[in-house]
Design a protein with these regions (language model features):
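Short, Lys/Arg-enriched N-terminal segments with co-localized hydrophobic residues
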Residues: 1-9
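Acidic, proline/glycine-rich low-complexity IDRs
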Residues: 13, 117-120, 128, 132-183
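Solvent-exposed, charged interface segments at domain starts and junctions
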Residues: 14-38, 101-124
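Long amphipathic alpha-helical segments
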Residues: 68-137
Length: 183
């Protein structure tokens, strides 16, 4: 993905939103996260936790730094992550974390209507994030500015609506796990 962007910026003086520095940096981190998650099964548990504690906050920061853009096409960007891929990702992370996958969450909408803590899962939240940023990365590979633009717009809207909060929510339990990784 980074090579696509570099090739384009070398061959043109385009200042389109999708080639501006904040967009390039966000997509670069998104691609790094996707590549790492796709190799999650091969990673040691401690390394996985540590890498998530580095990549997720960086992804959050890069998303926050993205300026607003407007859609250029009708409809929604193409979705690439299948239900099977999503579930495989979720299961790989859940297996890696074992019983530590579940955590009590208070920053969810359902908490308003409950006196009991809500159980959430690191694996599910990370799989949700993966789905959004992988779809973005795949749309970027089309090299069509309008498609890339609308994929960024859609990903940023989803960030504001749900996956930004999910990202922040998993940092707490991941931080705790990182402190007790040897136990």
């Amino acid at each position: 993905c980074k090579q696509i962007i570099q090739n384009h910026t070398m061959s043109t003086t385009s200042t389109h939103y999708v080639y501006q520095e904040p967009a390039i940096e966000f997509v670069t981190v998104a691609v790094q996260l996707c590549l790492y998650l796709e190799q999650a099964e091969e990673q040691e548990r401690a390394d996985f936790i540590e890498k998530m504690l580095c990549l997720l906050p960086l992804l959050y920061l890069k998303a926050r730094l993205l300026p607003k853009a407007t859609e250029e096409m009708d409809g929604y960007p193409e979705r690439f992550v299948t239900e099977y891929e999503y579930e495989s990702m979720r299961q790989a992370i859940a297996q890696k974390l074992g019983s530590d996958d579940a955590y009590l969450e208070v920053f969810v909408e359902d908490m308003r209507y409950s006196d009991e803590p809500i159980t959430a899962f690191i694996s599910e939240n990370i799989a949700d994030i993966y789905q959004e940023v992988k779809d973005l990365a795949c749309n970027y590979q089309t090299r069509e500015e309008a498609v890339m633009n609308d994929a960024l717009v859609s990903c940023l809207e989803a960030f504001e609506q749900h996956w930004g909060q999910k990202l922040l929510n998993v940092l707490r339990p991941l931080h705790t796990l990182s402190l007790h990784v040897d136990e």
